[in-house]
């Protein structure tokens, strides 16, 4: 991943549009939690989206705009993530331009680690994605917390494909 100033420069120039066609302003005064997922078919990602959905009201009351980014087509993102209404904005990044722009890493060993050590969670996620969840990349997730001026307050890079920023760290962001 890039250094903080490079990330700030990159995200301040991002022109994000969610899967419903709504523009997502960055640096206009709202705190933003960019939760950068793998594919929409990722079993672990589907579980995390469910957890975020359960906690979203708390975060939204604190004036945090949550933006979930998926390295998937809009149709896959709608089918696997947005089949139920989500209380946050969802961005499809099918060509992985955001991932490349942030220099996020991939790791087969980190994927294998999650599969071996998080088997119950994997099986739970597969119940949501079906067999499509078995064919995913080695891309690792990341979370970036931005203040209202697009200044990076926290970067969390995943240790494996099931890993995301702990909710307790997002609490400190409030």
Feature locations, PLM:
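N-terminal "domain-start" segment that seeds a small globular fold
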Residues: 1-27
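Short loop/turn microsegments at loop-to-beta-strand junctions
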Residues: 11-12, 31-33, 140-142
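Short active-site neighborhood of thiol/selenol oxidoreductases, capturing the structured segment around
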Residues: 25-52
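Short beta-strand/turn micro-motifs composed of small residues
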Residues: 37, 70, 147
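Structural microenvironment flanking redox-active thiols in thiol-disulfide oxidoreductases
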Residues: 48-101
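Thiol/selenol-based redox catalytic cores and closely related redox-interacting motifs
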Residues: 93-162
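A short, polar/charged loop-to-alpha-helix boundary motif
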Residues: 161-174
């Amino acid at each position: 991943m890039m250094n903080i100033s490079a990330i700030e420069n990159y995200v301040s120039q991002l022109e994000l549009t969610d899967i419903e066609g709504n523009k997502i302003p960055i640096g206009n005064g709202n705190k933003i939690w960019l939760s950068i997922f793998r594919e929409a078919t990722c079993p672990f990602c589907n579980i995390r989206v469910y957890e975020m959905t359960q906690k979203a009201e708390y975060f939204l009351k604190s004036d945090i705009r949550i933006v979930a980014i998926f390295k998937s087509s809009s149709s896959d993102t709608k089918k696997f993530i947005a089949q139920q209404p989500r209380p946050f904005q969802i961005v499809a990044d099918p060509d992985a331009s955001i991932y490349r722009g942030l220099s996020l890493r991939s790791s087969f060993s980190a994927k294998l680690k999650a599969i071996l050590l998080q088997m119950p969670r994997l099986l739970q996620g597969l119940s949501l994605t079906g067999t499509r969840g078995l064919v995913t990349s080695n891309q690792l997730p990341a979370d970036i917390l931005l203040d209202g001026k697009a200044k990076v307050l926290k970067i969390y890079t995943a240790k494996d494909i099931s890993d995301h920023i702990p909710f307790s760290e997002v609490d400190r962001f409030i």
